[in-house]
Amino acid sequence: MSTSKTITFTLFIAALLSSCDAATNATSQPLFPAILIFGDSTVDTGNNNYHSQTIFKAKHLPYGIDLPNHKASGRFTNGKIFSDIIATKLNIKQFVPPFLQPNLSDQEIVTGVCFASAGAGYDDHTSLSTQAIRVLDQQKMFKNYIARLKSIVGDKKAMEIIKNALVVISAGPNDFILNYYDIPSRRLEFPHISGYQDFVLQRLDNFVRELYSLGCRKIMVGGLPPMGCLPIQMTAKFRNALRFCLEQENRDSVLYNQKLQNLLPQIEASLTGSKILYSNVYDPMMDMMQNPSKYGFKETKRGCCGTGHLETSFMCNAFSPTCRNHSEFLFFDSIHPSEATYNYMGNFLDTQIRVWLSLRLKS
């Protein structure tokens, strides 16, 4: 099914579901017993705060300025990130804690944690340059989590929780930015972007299979956003005073996402009992870029922090001026969406998940 048909079908089903049983959607019962998060800064809720090797941290203002306590938590935006928003919409919990956070309660462990690390990617080269926690090492953290979970609820119950948990994987942009587009360290090995895409997808395939071997069955894998519309990419390929999306990088994202959509059913078919969902982030984000007023956005080509052209992580700090109304900006810094954007994305993906569950129950 083409991307346009997929999004149309999803929105049609969403309207159908919302008109059927409002009480069901409003139930306080969680749709999954736990949520387990892997990936990069789009889903890292603060693991890098406790990872001394990396400089990619968000434990300072203005990050977190719109959280309830107005304090930075390690999330790379002004408030909640996607991890928290989707966990809230699925009635699991309001905030997903980072696994490396000291003194996590038993309840936090039982209902799920985040293993993601800002700066990570599927390609090990990515973490070499960022010193983020490699995806492979996130898997090792997950093994430690399983041991802790078993000590709390016992072996059988622990594996039941993991089997029924929603696993979210969000990574990929750092691989292309740091190894191909801006720092071409992989271009000699892969002269054509298609070859590097296949390499990254093979690493993704291996990672999903490893999670399956550890007991995960319900897995949502995120595609790439419109990479050429990230403010930092517009800056990196600066041509004139008019900032615009880089069409070639967007076409690359579309091609990667098409390959990913073809790959995931193959992985699912080979892993008995697995249920794997492609998370479409490209289309809703592109719609926000092209129709900003529909979402209340006034700025889509630069971030809210500093100039919005380059600042991220330590470059976006307490001395950086910020925009007056954070919710009017699609991006909070030069890479990361604002909480408002994550909210819209969360609404879209919540619909995807509910449609997915509905169709699975009937199959």
From Swiss-Prot:
InterPro entries: GDSL, GDSL_lipolytic_enzyme, SGNH_hydro_sf, SGNH_plant_lipase-like. Its EC number is 3.1.1.-. One of its GO terms (biological process) is lipid catabolic process. The active site is at residues 41, 333, 336. CDD domains: SGNH_plant_lipase_like. The keyword Transmembrane helix does not apply. It holds the Pfam family Lipase_GDSL. One of its GO terms (molecular function) is hydrolase activity, acting on ester bonds. Glycans are attached at residues 25, 103, 325. It is found in: Secreted. One of its GO terms (cellular component) is extracellular region. Keywords: Glycoprotein, Hydrolase, Lipid degradation, Lipid metabolism, Secreted, Signal. It is an enzyme of class 3 (hydrolase). Residues 1-22 form the signal peptide. The keyword Repeat does not apply. Belongs to the 'GDSL' lipolytic enzyme family. This is GDSL esterase/lipase At2g24560. It comes from Arabidopsis thaliana (Mouse-ear cress).
